[in-house]
Amino acid sequence: VGVVEQLRKRLRCARCGAALEAETPDIACSRCGQKYFRLGRIPVLLPRPDDHLTLWRRQLGLLMAQSRQMTGALEAEAGNPELAEGAKLRLNALAHGVRDQLRQIVDVVGSALGGPLEPQESTGLPRGVVEYSYLLYRDWAWEKAGNQECQQSIDSIRSVVTTEKLGRMLVVGAGACRLAYDLHRFLGATETAVVDIDPFLFVFAEAIVRGAVVQFTEASTTVQELSRIARTWDLTAPDGPLGEDVFHFFLANGLSPPFADGTFDTVVTPWFIDQVPPDLPGFLTAVHRLLRPGGRWINHGPLIYPVDAPISRRYSREELFDLVSRAGFRIEPWRGDSQRHLVSPLTERGKMEWVLTFEAQPVK
């Protein structure tokens, strides 16, 4: 369902590595019997899919509880008769923004998950909402207000690729998916698979790529003017929808994507290799095995490592290139640029990041 025959035959079980049967609504492994479900229309190809669904529903429950607590606290504070009218307006506007944002997340993601579950003490908030929700605004809305970060990324990649014929492409850690969408549209991809482990971004992205107009409210506590406390954006695919026959979503482990060796002409890692792989050389081996002979790997992102990463593994560009060479790749053109990152038109705040972009081809 939703996967063309060629790629469907290349899917592999996340548990045992055997071929998957993907022609029925429930995907099943012919060897170990593991069954996989779909979250909405997205196959969940993770080793213990039911456990992940339970976690996601508990995260949704925690998000709902904390958002309602925050909204109640803001409204209670706004009810203080000693507050100035401007402060009351600001607090109430922020409360409305938080409430709208929660409602939109529940409408889009909650319905796909099957609703919330009571969180456990160990349950944490979903990173897709807490840390990465701004990617949805940036990818699918801010461009209408003049933000050029998406164009900046595609221009950087276009400047290093040796040919604009990406063929069958895998994007690992695709997040909100605008880069994957643009690469497919403009750099000659014939079929694209996107992989991520976070449904809170992916369910939004899948709806947008398929052609839906999704509303999502941006709210900020860092206020310069009362008119900039919150704004509801229309998230849309700027160049029209992409269908299930050419653009495929998979909730799966990006460190071990569930595909047979030699499946892809191009593998893309956007803002991924510095943050996610605990064993970067091991991950490079996985990238190598996924590429067919003559394929290429495209990387685009900074070198910003987790705070708990050993300093010895916070590789410089030169060290990274040495690891890439040892993994059997040849680096083609590359560039490093300081680029604007998540500069919101609402707040006019954001970051500058040094971003490394390169193409590498397997040589053995």
Language model segments and positions:
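Conserved Class I S-adenosyl-L-methionine-dependent methyltransferase catalytic core
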Residues: 37, 42-160
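A short glycine-rich, Lys/Arg-flanked "PGG" loop and its adjoining helix->strand segment in the class I
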Residues: 281-293
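Core SAM-dependent methyltransferase catalytic element
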Residues: 327, 340-364
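S-adenosyl-L-methionine
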Residues: 209-255
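Conserved beta-strand signature within the Rossmann-like core of class I S-adenosyl-L-methionine
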Residues: 294-303
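Conserved class I S-adenosyl-L-methionine
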Residues: 165-175, 193
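A short acidic, Gly/Pro-enriched loop at the edge of an enzyme's catalytic core
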Residues: 252-267
